Amino acid sequence: MNRILFLACAAVLSANAKTIQMPPTCTTPDGMCVDSKGRLVIATPNNDRTQPGAVFRLDKPCGTPVKWFDVPPCKESGYASPMGICFGPAGELYVCDNQKDSKGRLLCITFKDDKIDKCEVVAEGLDNANGVKYLNGKLYLTQAFLYSVKRGDGAATSGLYMFSASDRNVKVCNTPADEQCVFSDVTRNPQIRGGLNGVAVDAKGFIYTGNYGDGRVWKLMPGADGRIIKSEEILHAGGLSVTPDGMCVDCSGNLYIADMRGDALQRILPDGKVEFLRKGGFVRPSEPCVWKGAVYVANYGGTTLEVVPLCGSGCCQR
């Protein structure tokens, strides 16, 4: 059973928390990661379509975010909707392009002189490309909905997919029978339908993902070939997390979770303790990223990032 720990420094955290306003060209901040130059990188799907889907940078803590580049649009839809992002070891950026009508893509973007040099499609035909992380030459991508699966009970099916970083133009069918689907889950909550959403990896090679609708969080062990060989539910349905969305792990093995409908930022320690770093004051928090001694949280329902200082925790992030 998880132990709940409300931090003694919670009041200090709230008092010292800051808000960063994104530029007008960002209407929906979401996925985040840190690049090899130590900059915070932010994906913005811009759901209202008044602006193109883009990637922004924050070069220093509490600085001013700037647009880095527009994500090359899908030819069929005419737009890009970047959500989850992560970097590979050679500095390439992997982007979940969350499209409707099974037009989603996983992109690999390489750079020259800080500008896009090449944009390639790793996988296509995705129902709901959401989060992505790189681990040992593999890319682990969540699909919160597998719309192709029709269940008699109406429950929603979701999946964790694995691709090789060298894959290009892989077409998926969006069912657990896909060769690339290494873990699937069913959401039982009839009020909140989304399934596997956020994804994170730690230094020991474990993978974490959460069922958004049920409030469950999984710790997964991949085998030598990258496929999942063991799963453990570390947060249970109806428990502490209402809707676990984006997540990340720091170098101390702490797991941070943005709880969108719970309006909270949680941290699960390696010993299983659950801390609420902040409860309230977000606008549909979707993604956390540990950077330079603080947790930066994307307000998916707004146009800002919340900066929550940490109390003596490791400041590197995976």
Describe the predicted segments one by one.
Residues N16-C26:
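A short helix->beta-strand "capping" segment at the edge of beta-propeller domains
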Residues I20-Q21, P65-P72, D117-E124, K171-D185, ...:
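Beta-propeller fold detector
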Residues P24-R39, A43, Q51-P52, P73-L93, ...:
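Beta-rich, blade/repeat-based domains predominating
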Residues I42-V66:
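Beta-propeller domains
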Residues P45-N47, N98-K100, A144-Y147, A165, ...:
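Short loop/turn segments immediately following the C-termini of beta-strands
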Residues P52-R57, R105-C108, S158-Y161, R216-W218, ...:
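A short loop-to-beta-strand structural motif that recurs across blades of beta-propeller domains
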Residues D59-G63, T110-K115, S164-R168, M221-G226, ...:
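Short loop/turn segments that connect beta-strands within beta-propeller blades
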Residues T209-L220, H236-I268:
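Loop/turn-rich, solvent-exposed surfaces of beta-rich toroidal or solenoidal domains
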